C-alpha cells in the first residue's frame, strides 16, 4: 500500500466520523426575548403595563404615624389590677400607626375607561389591653366610564381644606353611582346601601350632585335622602383661588337627623389654605353648628362652634408632617381642645 493510499483512507475515515458526530449533536434553543415592564402614560404618572396585557396598573400608598390629643383620646383601657368594666380608664393622648396600599387597574374599552380599584388599611393601635390592630378594606369598586359600583367614598366625603370642618356624617357606602363629566360641568346620582346607619339593617339612600367650575372658582350642590328615616340633607360648597391660597365656604341643612347628616339642623363652615412657601401651608378654619341633635330622630336648641388651625409641611419628596389644633365650645357641654401630630411617607 502506498503512502498516498494510506493518507487518503485516513482522511475519509475522519470525515465519516465527524459527519456522524454532527448528526447527533444537541443544538441549544435560542433564548426567548424577555418582556420588560413597560411604562403606561395613558392614565397619568405611575402606571405600568401588566406583562402580556394592555391593562395599566398603579400601586400606591402611605405609611403614617400619628399621635392624637384631647379628652378621652383613648378611652377603653383597663388597669392591670382589674379588667372589669368598673375599672375602665381613659387617656388624653393616643398614638397609632397605619399602612395604606392601593391597586388601580385601568384599560381602554369601547365604552370608556374600565377601572378596578382596591385599597386596604393596616392599623396598629394599642387602645385596648388586648390590642385592636386590624385590617380594613378602604375601597373596592369597578368603574366603566361614568358608571361606578362597589364600596367607595361618596360625594359627601369631600370637605374643606384643613382639619376643622365636619360636613358629612356617613361618607362611605356600598353604592351604584353614575357621574356625567362635561369638564366644567358635572352631574351625578347615587343609590346607597345605608346598612347600620338607619332604623333597619339595610336601608336605602339616594344622593345627587351638580358641580360647576369657572377658572379658579368651583361650586358643588349636593343632596341626600334617607328612605328609612324619610329625612334629607342639602349641602353647598364653594371653593375659590384667592391670593396665595384657596378660600372655601360650606353650608348645609337637614330636615331631621339622617344617614347623610345628623350633627345639627344647620351648619356653616369656612377655611383658608395659605400657601406660605412651596413646602409650608397654614389653614385656619371655623364652623358653627345650629340646633344640635338631641335624640335619634330630632334636633334640639343647643348650638356649638369650633375653630382651629392646620399646618402642613413637606419635609422632602414623599415625606410630610401635619399638625392640627382645634377648639370646640358646645352649649351645656365642656369646652374641648383636641388635635394630632402626624408624620406620613407617601409612595
Predicted regions, residues:
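Outer-membrane beta-barrel pore domains and translocons
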Residues: 64-66, 119-123, 152-156, 190-195, ...
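Detector for outer-membrane/organellar transmembrane beta-barrel domains
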Residues: 184, 201-308
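N-terminal periplasmic/intermembrane-space "pro-region" immediately following the signal or transit peptide
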Residues: 1-64
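Outer-membrane beta-barrel architecture
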Residues: 11, 47-49, 102-104, 141-143, ...
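Transmembrane beta-strands of outer-membrane beta-barrel proteins
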Residues: 57-65, 109, 114-118, 147-149, ...
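Outer-membrane beta-barrel "beta-signal"
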Residues: 4, 18, 240, 313-315, ...
Amino acid at each position: 500500500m502506498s503512502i498516498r493510499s494510506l493518507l487518503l483512507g485516513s482522511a475519509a475515515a475522519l470525515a465519516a466520523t465527524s459527519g456522524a458526530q454532527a448528526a447527533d449533536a444537541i443544538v441549544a434553543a435560542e433564548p426567548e426575548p424577555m418582556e420588560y415592564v413597560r411604562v403606561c402614560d395613558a392614565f397619568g404618572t405611575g402606571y405600568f403595563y401588566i406583562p402580556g396585557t394592555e391593562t395599566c396598573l398603579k400601586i400606591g400608598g402611605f405609611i403614617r404615624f400619628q399621635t392624637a390629643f384631647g379628652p378621652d383620646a383613648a378611652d377603653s383601657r383597663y388597669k392591670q389590677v382589674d379588667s372589669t368594666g368598673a375599672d375602665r380608664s381613659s387617656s388624653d393622648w393616643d398614638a397609632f400607626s397605619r399602612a395604606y396600599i392601593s391597586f388601580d387597574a385601568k384599560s381602554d374599552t369601547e365604552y370608556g375607561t374600565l377601572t378596578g380599584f382596591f385599597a386596604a388599611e393596616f392599623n396598629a393601635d394599642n387602645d385596648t389591653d388586648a390590642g385592636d390592630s386590624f385590617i380594613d378594606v378602604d375601597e373596592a369598586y369597578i368603574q366603566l366610564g361614568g358608571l361606578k359600583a362597589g364600596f367607595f367614598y361618596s360625594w359627601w366625603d369631600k370637605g374643606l381644606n384643613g382639619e376643622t370642618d365636619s360636613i358629612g356624617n356617613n361618607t362611605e357606602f356600598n353604592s351604584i353611582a353614575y357621574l356625567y363629566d362635561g369638564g366644567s360641568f358635572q352631574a351625578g346620582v347615587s343609590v346607597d346601601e345605608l346598612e347600620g346607619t338607619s332604623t333597619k339593617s339595610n336601608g336605602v339612600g339616594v344622593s345627587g350632585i351638580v358641580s360647576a367650575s369657572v377658572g379658579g372658582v368651583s361650586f358643588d350642590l349636593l343632596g341626600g335622602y334617607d328612605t328609612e328615616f324619610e329625612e334629607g340633607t342639602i349641602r353647598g360648597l364653594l371653593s375659590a383661588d384667592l391670593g396665595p391660597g384657596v378660600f372655601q365656604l360650606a353650608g348645609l341643612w337637614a330636615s331631621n337627623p339622617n344617614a347623610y347628616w345628623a350633627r345639627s339642623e344647620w351648619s356653616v363652615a369656612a377655611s383658608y389654605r395659605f400657601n406660605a412657601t412651596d413646602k409650608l401651608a397654614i389653614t385656619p378654619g371655623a364652623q358653627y353648628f345650629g340646633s344640635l341633635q338631641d335624640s335619634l330622630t330630632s334636633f334640639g336648641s343647643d348650638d356649638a362652634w369650633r375653630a382651629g388651625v392646620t399646618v402642613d409641611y413637606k419635609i422632602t419628596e414623599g415625606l410630610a408632617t401635619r399638625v392640627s389644633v382645634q377648639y370646640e365650645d358646645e352649649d351645656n357641654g365642656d369646652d374641648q381642645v383636641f388635635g394630632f401630630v402626624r408624620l406620613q411617607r407617601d409612595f
